[in-house]
Amino acid sequence: MKKTFAFILLSIISLANAQQTDIRYIPVISTDTISTKANLYPHVLSKNKFNPLVFENGFKVGERREAVRLWDKDIFYLEFTDRKMNKRVFRQMPELKKNGKLFEIMLQGDVSWYRRYFSYRADTWDANYEHEDYFVKGDEIVNIPVKGRYKKKLKALLSDKPEITKEVDQMVGDRDIREILEKYNSK
């Protein structure tokens, strides 16, 4: 009886300790997933504007809210809801040959749209950031750098559907690009 009681007590203690293990580091090659609340600091000048560079500076994970520095090269996939309740998805894109960089998935389809954020002041929470866009159509990759010439490159990429390329001249911002690409992908 004493041996059975000791065995049950030892089993309960070992199970209780096994479930309280803190996550320290998950390597890139791991298939593990961290599901946690993260303290994603907003852009200091505008509380409703999310600064996508916060994961470069690290954020707090786990129940004890310990600071863990996570670099984008250590994260394969990152998904969260921003302050405007928009679902944001970032992942590494090996086909874009920028290994270790996270790209936001703006739109996927026949022509996919990805965005990479960067800054020259990424060491501060209030870093002003820039972005460059990548459009992928089959094996063709079109890179539009910061303040690049969207219209000319998009027209060339979408040239097989002339009715859509006419709309490229009137586009102004991201919403217009999304609408044009959604039309292209649906036809």
Spans of features found by a protein language model:
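Positively charged n-region of N-terminal signal peptides that target proteins for export
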Residues: 1-4, 19
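Residue-level detector of intrinsically disordered/flexible regions characterized by low predicted structural confidence
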Residues: 4-5, 103
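Hydrophobic h-region of N-terminal signal peptides that target proteins for export
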Residues: 9-18
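Intrinsically disordered, low-complexity regions enriched in polar/acidic and amide residues
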Residues: 18-19, 91
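Aromatic-patch recognition
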Residues: 24-164
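C-terminal partner/receptor-binding element of secreted or periplasmic proteins
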Residues: 154-187
